Every structure is written in structure tokens, then in C-alpha cells.
């Protein structure tokens, strides 16, 4: 028996086929390279491309559209330029640059695109984020109130940093800027802070040394290193800080705390200037393009302390700027000083005279960190800045006047001892309770009758003595975070007992 063919069934099938017929064609917009030089390709034919959009060249190299002109597009090449020649085809990828984020990156060294460069295998990241993100608004933020201890006495006592702050480290070359940053990373051990170190335009050997130092102190367990070396293209150096801050924002947005160090933003500005001049953008002051302020402001504004509703996470930024012969009034230094919440100024004169870290306490300031400083540190360092300022004034005066009155001489001597107290060898950050004890000893006159040369020995022997005989002092400061009358009395007793046993020899 032959099956009956129903006309309405056939028409229903035909209708369904017509409705489901997909006429869309996957159109790929392609262009041709007109010229290529210095890591920038001029491309003709990509009429609908967006600013910041990713493209792919014939050999698989990626690029990013930065200049949109009437007849051509200026594309910076994110990789090797050797395979790209005049006439090479370029296709739009219709997406913006994203980098991997998350815990999988911790302990790794990556490039500006988040690709591993440490020969430890691929990174199994489950999430990616846009490199360019808008900074959080006012309502999403909370004022800085938790301390971020650097472990450096001069900073934690006089220029305190809070979680979510932007504090600039500024100084000439070879004044210990990177050392301050590495000390801060080492001091975050056990503090549940993820650190991101962004190296921009540095020698590969220097970055390798930093990574080795971090591994030596076990700091790579909670650190990500983003490296765009001196041999990398200007485009990769330009992208490195944005890639780093994107990785840091992931932790901040997940109710965690992160610290990011940009080493350094002077080289970042130079890379951006190089890229802009090749793209034929009009130069301004010091040949930097007009939007160089925006380059750094949009980067540093992404560091913040989030409010409780958003999880109370934080991202603290420590940008580094290199000055020429101590000139802080140059274009880039003044820009970054005005964007940040304070600066730590390192001086080559202090460094050369043996005061290390070479922090100029008079020029260094923290505009918001005071609220984050623990009460015990506030109590002992309240007059320290003023005392040091008076000491410097007296020191300048004493060079010309031989006969000083008794009180001036005492003030000069105590100032000298306090300068010694604030000295610290590199890669040896101090817990906050130890800092409180030694600054207390100096400010209460326990070092007055000890020679300046013996202060370091006094300090080195004091901590183990208190740990052995009066462990409750450290414990109380650590937990209570305040010097009450009881601890003060105990501290006086401990210092008197220690002085009785201390010998200079």
C-alpha cells in the first residue's frame, strides 16, 4: 500500500525549511599592509574597524588598531615584525584585547599578553578580562583605612601606605627604588596580599635578578611578574601596566587584596611617546603626545579600595618614576605626583652618604595613609618628622657654628641616632611590632648615651632579647595595635634591663 502524500504536510515542511534557511554569510573584512616600520603597520581597507580592536596578520601575528584615518589604519604589531611585509593581508578579529586572570598566574612570569615566558608550561587560566577597563566610580569606593605594611621603618612610621592607595616611589637611577618595592613584596608574606610586579623596558638580566630574589625569599608563591623588556616592542611595553592592573583587579573584585608595582612609568611614557611619534601623532611638551597625562591617570585610577557591598577588596599601586638629576619638576614626574596620593622621594646624596633606604623625609608625604597607620606606630612616631626636620636644620647650622648650646647639641645627637634607627639593610623588612619598639627606644632617649656607630648592634641584639625575656610585648603590640600604659611600662622595664646587659664591644 503506497503512503498517501498529504499536500498540507509537504507545504508545512517546505515552510519550515524556508524559515530555517540561514542566509547569513560569514564576512571577513580584510585589508592590505601599505607600509611597515618600527613595529607599526599602515593598513588600507579596514573601513569598519574600531579603535583598540585586535587584528591578525598573515603569519598569525596579532596587532592592535590605534590610529583611525580616512584612508588607512595605524596598527601596532604585538610581536615579531619580520614576517609582515608590504602587501601582506590583515583581517579584523572584531574583539578587543583580553588577558588571562586568576590564581593560575600566581608564581609565573608572563609577557604583556599574559603568555608565559618562564618555561614552566602553559597557564591554565579559566577567565580572561579586557585590558582596558573603566576605573571604579566614587560610590563603589571606600576611604583607605587598612595599613599595607612595607616592613621599612622610615616608610611605615613617616609615610604610611594604606590598602587601596597609590603611592609614588620617585628618585634618580641607582637610589634603591626597586629595592623598596621588592622589600614591600617580601613583607606581604602571610598577609594574604597577591603582588604583581610589572617590569617595563628593563634589561632581561635585571628582571631575572628580581625574580631570583623573590624566589629566594619565597615571595613568588604569591607574586605575578609581568615583563615587557627593553628588547620588546614599544607596543608591548605600553600594554604591560594595563595587563598587570587587569590581573590585580580580578583579586580586588573577588574580595581579596592585591599590590601592584610599576617599574617604571618613565620608561612606559617613553615607549608611548615612541609609538605615538611613529603613528605621526602631534608631539607636545618634551615631545610627549598630548594625552600622556591620561595614559597614567586612567592606569592609576584603577587602583582602589572597594566598599563593603562590593566585597571590600583592595588594589594598592606603587608606581616608580625615575628622575634626571633629582628634577621632580619635569613633565612626567609632575604628572604622576599629581595623580598619586603621595610620594616617597629617594635622594642620591643620601644614598651615597650611607643613609639607606635613602628616603628624604622632608619631601616624602602620604596624603591618605595616615588613616591606615596602626595606633601604636602613630604614638611612637608622632613627633619623629618634626624632630628629624629640626635635626637637619641644626646640622646645617652646626657646619658653620662650632659652639652649640647644650640643648642644641643633645638635639643634634638624638637626631643622629634616629637617622641611624631608620637605616635598614635591603631585603630585610621588619614586622611592625619590632619597628614600634626601636622607634620607642630612640624617641624616649634610650639611645642617647650610645654611640651612633653602635645603634645597629643595639637594635640587632634588642629584638632577640625581648623575644626571649618579654615575648608578651611583641604579642600585645601585634594583637592590640596600641601602646597602652601597661605595655609602655613593660617596654621601659625591658629597655632598662637590656641596656644593663648591652656592651658596645
Curated annotation (Swiss-Prot):
**A GO term, aspect molecular function:** proton-transporting ATP synthase activity, rotational mechanism
Alphabetically sorted, this entry's keywords are: ATP synthesis, ATP-binding, Cell inner membrane, Cell membrane, CF(1), Hydrogen ion transport, Ion transport, Membrane, Nucleotide-binding, Translocase, Transport
Task: Note the CDD domains from the entry.
Answer: ATP-synt_F1_alpha_C (cd18113), ATP-synt_F1_alpha_N (cd18116), F1-ATPase_alpha_CD (cd01132)
Q: Which InterPro entries match?
A: ATP_synth_asu-like_sf (IPR023366), ATP_synth_asu_C (IPR000793), ATP_synth_asu_C_sf (IPR038376), ATP_synth_F1_a_nt-bd_dom (IPR033732), ATP_synth_F1_asu (IPR005294), ATPase_a/bsu_AS (IPR020003), ATPase_F1/V1/A1_a/bsu_N (IPR004100), ATPase_F1/V1/A1_a/bsu_N_sf (IPR036121)
Q: What class of enzyme is it?
A: translocase
Q: Where does ATP bind?
A: 171-178
Q: Where is this site: Required for activity?
A: 364
Q: Where in the cell is it found?
A: Cell inner membrane
Source organism, top-level taxon? Bacteria
Write the Enzyme Commission number(s) for this entry: 7.1.2.2
Principal location class: membrane
Could you tell me the membrane topology recorded for this protein?
A: Peripheral membrane protein
The Gene Ontology CC terms held by the record are:
plasma membrane; proton-transporting ATP synthase complex
**Which reaction is recorded as catalysed by this protein?**
ATP + H2O + 4 H(+)(in) = ADP + phosphate + 5 H(+)(out)
HAMAP family from the xrefs? Answer: ATP_synth_alpha_bact
Q: Which family does it belong to?
A: Belongs to the ATPase alpha/beta chains family.
NCBIfam families membership: atpA, PRK13343.1
Q: What does this protein do?
A: Produces ATP from ADP in the presence of a proton gradient across the membrane. The alpha chain is a regulatory subunit.
Q: How does it assemble?
A: F-type ATPases have 2 components, CF(1) - the catalytic core - and CF(0) - the membrane proton channel. CF(1) has five subunits: alpha(3), beta(3), gamma(1), delta(1), epsilon(1). CF(0) has three main subunits: a(1), b(2) and c(9-12). The alpha and beta chains form an alternating ring which encloses part of the gamma chain. CF(1) is attached to CF(0) by a central stalk formed by the gamma and epsilon chains, while a peripheral stalk is formed by the delta and b chains.
Q: Specify the protein name.
A: ATP synthase subunit alpha
Organism classification: Bacteria, Pseudomonadati, Campylobacterota, Epsilonproteobacteria, Campylobacterales
